[in-house]
């Protein structure tokens, strides 16, 4: 009863087409049957909706179980060059050599994401840990001004990129650098209008 009622309410408010539904975070082969069960339960109720999951196992997309994969940047090699029309990415905690916005990471590793989004024609970025002010699994709340590692359960900065303020979110220096990366993405798209995508990528 809940899902059809939710869909009807979203349509009534005019936001259904902009809504994205989610089944499970990072499903892998050991939970394939359970994921299929959930997928087959929800799909008939939301037949015209879009589904997105954080997904690093390409086989789930290959089997038509996920419309929009949001892939961990460290796992993108399995998706690049495949027929994925709406590829999103995200990053979480540190992996050597990939874009990341942890406190201990140099800014270039944060900003470089913008160029990568352009080069691989990524359609969106899923913010993992945008404003997570809890310990792992949300057992306790934390003050991000005093504890930057989710109570020593994550790498510092992996769990948030904005701070809570009296009148809304306050951008961290990492969020500002991330914005610069998005400006790089916009610059690449503008360059493409003048010289074409192939030449823009060659210049990169």
Where are these regions (language model features)?
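Catalytic-core regions of glycoside hydrolase
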Residues: 1-138
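Catalytic domains of carbohydrate-active enzymes that cleave complex glycans
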Residues: 1-32, 41-56, 138-204
């Amino acid at each position: 009863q809940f899902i059809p009622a939710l869909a009807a309410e979203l349509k009534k408010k005019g936001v259904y087409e902009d809504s994205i539904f989610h089944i499970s975070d990072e499903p892998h082969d050991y939970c394939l049957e359970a994921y299929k069960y959930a997928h087959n339960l929800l799909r008939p109720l939301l037949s015209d909706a879009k589904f997105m999951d954080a997904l690093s196992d390409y086989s789930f997309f290959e089997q038509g179980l996920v419309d929009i994969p949001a892939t961990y940047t460290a796992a993108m090699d399995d998706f690049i060059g495949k027929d994925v029309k709406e590829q999103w990415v995200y990053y979480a905690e540190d992996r050597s050599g990939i874009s990341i916005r942890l406190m201990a990471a140099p800014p270039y590793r944060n900003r470089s994401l913008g160029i990568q989004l352009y080069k691989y024609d990524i359609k969106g970025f899923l913010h993992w840990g945008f404003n997570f002010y809890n310990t792992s699994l949300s057992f306790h709340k934390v003050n991000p001004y005093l504890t930057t590692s989710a109570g020593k359960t994550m790498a510092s900065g992996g769990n948030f990129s904005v701070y809570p303020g009296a009148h809304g979110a306050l951008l961290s220096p990492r969020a500002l650098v991330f914005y610069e990366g998005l400006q790089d993405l916009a610059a690449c798209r503008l360059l493409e209008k003048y010289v074409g995508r192939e030449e823009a990528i060659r210049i990169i």
